[in-house]
Amino acid sequence: MERKRISSSRIRSAGYDDKTRTLEIEFSDGRISAYMDVAPDIYRGLMSAPSPVAYFEDRIVEDYTASRIK
């Protein structure tokens, strides 16, 4: 999955697959986690948020289970 860079201290990049509704997050420490059944507006919100980390913590961590990829 192609990920786009994010200007953030903790998140390096994020990508989204419309067909599977999978959100991938690459963290600054190199970990990559996948979040399943994520609505497209959640991904768009993350990418446009003034604080991607705050958005991630408020809207993704609380509502979706992560599977570690790397």
Where are these regions (language model features)?
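Acidic/histidine-enriched, beta-strand-rich ligand/metal-binding domains
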Residues: 1-70
